[in-house]
Amino acid sequence: MICPVIELAQQLIKRPSLSPSDAGCQEIMIQRLAAIGFTIEPMNFGDTLNFWAWRGEGETLAFAGHTDVVPTGDESHWHSPPFEPTIRDGMLYGRGAADMKGSLAAMIVAAERFVAAHPDHKGRLAFMITSDEEAKATNGTVKVVEALMARHERLDYCLVGEPSSTDRVGDIVKNGRRGSITANLRIHGVQGHVAYPHLADNPVHRAMPALNELVATQWDEGNAFFPATSMQIANLQAGTGSNNVIPGEFYVQFNFRFSTELTDSLIKQRVAALLDRHQLDYTLEWVLSGQPFLTAKGALVDAVVNAVKHYTEITPQLLTTGGTSDGRFIALMGAQVVELGPVNATIHKVNECVSAADLQLLSRMYQKIMEQLIA
């Protein structure tokens, strides 16, 4: 008899939910949750499907995740079609197997088992699901959180099912994430002929000392939970394509992944002061993708660590490394936020896969977390 977690994961993987498409995944989840007494509230925005579901009342534990997946790449490089889930050598293959339809299946089955064992559970169990995490992330969790905050919805704990693990399920738990802010800098000069530089003003030449200082700056030293803030230049653009024209404008895009030692406003101030010292003529636009968040300790971290230890006999590392996740939006509700999911070695790659046994373990861990917090 096939494991219910694997069976549900396969149903979800069959749906080609390329972001922000949901392709019917949420309807499968909604039917399962409604069958065990959850109230379902669709919260759709633009081209994005979201839902908020809950059962019970009081102290609230939510499970969060996304049904959308990234593009498959060249399908001829896959050993089996990416939307035809296949099990080989104990591994479940398919786009979204690890990121994160396997986690979604583990969550749903954990909820079914939990409700069967604790039909009158004392707290509230909730689900926050979106189809817009992998692409723009503009009409997904961020909009749901805004709506929930506007009506003062309670959220105490949130478990995000992102693939956090490295070598074996549960070895890494993300108890926070760095913030992310991107600068779009345009340095203005005067276009001209390269043979007559005195009649032009080359913005690339003017910018180099400032960019050198930008790269050499140590923005902070990090702290016990976060590595030092990282600044990386991502894109440069100047010139007309001709070898005899001095460019009139120089575009530089750079990104900060910042710790709780900094704020976005402090980064903006320091960058502006640096550019002004170099007397540049510039315009600067900022895009804040997310603030850093940290769940240093508390009931949720304890419950997650206990659940992992119970089923694997390993003590997970608590880390804040990696990119951003929807946890950055959920943390704004004041909730404790932790990420626990399968091994991330193949996410976004050709032949994405996850251990079938790991998904079964993960579902048991999720159930154990529910039992510790809201049973």
UniProtKB/Swiss-Prot annotation:
Zn(2+) 1 binds at H66, D99, E162. Pathway: Amino-acid biosynthesis; L-lysine biosynthesis via DAP pathway; LL-2,6-diaminopimelate from (S)-tetrahydrodipicolinate (succinylase route): step 3/3. One of its GO terms (biological process) is lysine biosynthetic process via diaminopimelate. The active site is at D68, E133 (proton acceptor). It is an enzyme of class 3 (hydrolase). Zn(2+) 2 binds at D99, E134, H348. InterPro entries: ArgE/DapE_CS, Bact_exopeptidase_dim_dom, DapE_proteobac, Peptidase_M20, Peptidase_M20_dimer, Peptidase_M20A. It comes from the Bacteria. Catalyzes the hydrolysis of N-succinyl-L,L-diaminopimelic acid (SDAP), forming succinate and LL-2,6-diaminopimelate (DAP), an intermediate involved in the bacterial biosynthesis of lysine and meso-diaminopimelic acid, an essential component of bacterial cell walls. HAMAP family: DapE (MF_01690). CDD domains: M20_DapE_proteobac. Its cofactor is Zn(2+); Co(2+). Pfam families: M20_dimer, Peptidase_M20. This is Succinyl-diaminopimelate desuccinylase. Its EC number is 3.5.1.18. Keywords: Amino-acid biosynthesis, Cobalt, Diaminopimelate biosynthesis, Hydrolase, Lysine biosynthesis, Metal-binding, Zinc. The gene is dapE. It catalyses: N-succinyl-(2S,6S)-2,6-diaminopimelate + H2O = (2S,6S)-2,6-diaminopimelate + succinate. Homodimer. GO terms for molecular function: acetylornithine deacetylase activity; cobalt ion binding; succinyl-diaminopimelate desuccinylase activity; zinc ion binding. Belongs to the peptidase M20A family. DapE subfamily. Binds 2 Zn(2+) or Co(2+) ions per subunit. The keyword Secreted does not apply.
